[in-house]
């Protein structure tokens, strides 16, 4: 199923690397301690050229919409998604550059990618943690925003008040420490007039394993 009002996927869409710039020094990074062992980091304007990359991905990615079963009922997920289980042949060379920069900075090899497409403010993601891609006690999960700004909420898994971030196009949100064990996050519904947003979740097959290789 294609996105509302979007063109169907087209293959082999690339833009020049020099149209995309990364802040490899992470100079704007601001880290917030969520508790004694969990943190979240916002890196404003980590990627420049995000709108051009957004347009490329909207056309090139084979977006799909899936059903999910909850409480014995079948629901259509309120967003489109895509997964690339390998970055060896990346959809876009800029994504390989981004994965390399993240690996150098955070010391984690990011080798696959999960993408969410929020077509407008009606699309959302409910409260969850990344339990399948983050099986170790401590993981580092970078999420890059392209397109419209949307609220990104986090709250303790055991219950409590939420904190809100609002990443804009090119901003990076990074969850670290025990965030995927002890906290949950979501992108709530908003005004329908809000534009298209893509989130790129950089994932690591190493973090998806329960214990490190010996």
Language-model regions, residue ranges each:
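Non-heme Fe(II) oxygenase metal-center motifs and adjacent flexible, charged/small-residue loops
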Residues: 1-214
């Amino acid at each position: 199923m294609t996105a509302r009002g979007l063109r169907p996927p087209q293959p082999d869409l690339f833009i020049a690397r020099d149209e995309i710039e990364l802040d490899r020094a992470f100079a704007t990074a601001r880290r917030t301690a969520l508790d004694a062992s969990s943190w979240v980091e916002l890196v404003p304007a980590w990627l420049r050229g995000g709108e051009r990359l957004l347009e490329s991905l909207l056309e090139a990615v084979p977006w799909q919409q899936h059903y999910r079963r909850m409480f014995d009922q079948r629901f259509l997920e309120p967003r489109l998604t895509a997964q690339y289980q390998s970055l060896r042949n990346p959809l876009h060379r800029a994504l390989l550059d981004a994965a390399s920069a993240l690996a150098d900075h955070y010391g984690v090899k990011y080798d696959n990618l999960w993408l969410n497409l929020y077509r407008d403010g009606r699309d959302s993601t409910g409260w969850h943690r990344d339990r399948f891609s983050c099986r170790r006690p401590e993981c580092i999960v970078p999420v890059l925003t392209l397109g419209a700004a949307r609220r990104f909420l986090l709250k303790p898994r055991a219950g409590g008040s939420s904190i809100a971030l609002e990443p804009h196009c090119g901003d990076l949100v990074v969850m670290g420490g025990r965030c995927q064990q002890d906290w949950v996050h979501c992108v709530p519904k908003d005004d329908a007039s809000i534009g298209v947003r893509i989130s790129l979740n950089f994932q690591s097959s190493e973090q998806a394993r329960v214990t490190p290789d010996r």
